[in-house]
Amino acid sequence: MAEIRSRQLDFSEESQEERRRYLRSKPVPLVRNGAGDLWMVDRHHRLRALLELDSRVSTYGYVIAEVESHDRSDVLRELQRRGWLYLHDGRGKGPCPPEQLPSSLLDLEDDPYRSLVWKLKKEGVLRPQPLIPYHEFRWGAWLRSRPLPPFHSGFLDPALPAARRLARSAAASHLAGWKGEA
């Protein structure tokens, strides 16, 4: 939720024209099924932030793949096959069956480790990887397996020093976006 709250602050300070320009520069990658339904592959946090501010918001997108089937299960299987689903809950438990994914962005669970990774990216500890969906969650899962002091998405400070050290360590070198020592 840390990224969502930060983006909401940014969006609330922008004019409608500034917001439109920003959204045009960050289109949402989509998968379209045979019925014409669209599935988001990335930008979930950004759009959730906007939806919470304005439930009628619209954005720009582009289709990166098409799945002929009309069946939701077939589409979910294809997304999973391509690595375009993250099937863990906010506590890192999973994988859960794809059919249990929420159908609304507003129903996605908070993952404090994903928030921690967002903060590390924002600080420049991690390199952005726009072509690798869900790499932030992979980082979060990795950090979750390491000892960190108690924290939550609204209060990341206790975990940041240890998370920075871990993210720069050689043990993290297999993760997309790793930069190593500063």
Model-predicted segments: where are they?
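Active-site-adjacent structural elements in enzyme catalytic domains
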Residues: 44-46
